[in-house]
């Protein structure tokens, strides 16, 4: 199954803000890179995020709103980015950039960039 860039961006946004992951968009060689969640291949990523319980508990349950949430498509038709700021229950806010790479209608890489210490503080983690 292959997806358009717009579909992959939409699926990725849904996963980020709701925890609902569409595993069909992930290429066999998919890689996820994140300061908190570490680097994961497809199998490890699915193990962590297909069931959203831990992601919701550690992250989403603390977020009160996303504002702004901006999506951009690369001119090359292979890359996209999401720039977002979220606010948490303890009054903190975090800026995050999410970079995606698409090949042959499948997501091959997702890289999340943010200040790890600010993120831990925002979520009340040590």
Question: Residue ranges of each PLM-predicted region?
Answer:
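C-terminal and inter-domain tail/linker signature
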Residues: 1-126
């Amino acid at each position: 199954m292959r997806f358009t860039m717009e579909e992959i961006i939409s699926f990725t946004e849904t996963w980020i803000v709701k925890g609902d992951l569409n595993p069909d968009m992930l290429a066999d060689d998919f890689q996820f890179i994140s300061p908190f969640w570490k680097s994961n291949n497809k199998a490890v990523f699915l193990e962590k995020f297909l069931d959203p319980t831990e992601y919701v508990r550690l992250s989403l349950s603390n977020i009160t709103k996303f504002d702004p949430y901006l999506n951009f498509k690369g001119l090359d038709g292979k890359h996209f980015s999401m720039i977002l700021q979220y606010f948490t229950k303890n009054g903190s806010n975090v800026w995050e950039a999410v970079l995606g790479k698409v090949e042959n209608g499948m997501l091959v890489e997702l890289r999340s960039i943010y200040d790890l210490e600010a993120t831990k503080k925002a979520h009340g983690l040590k």
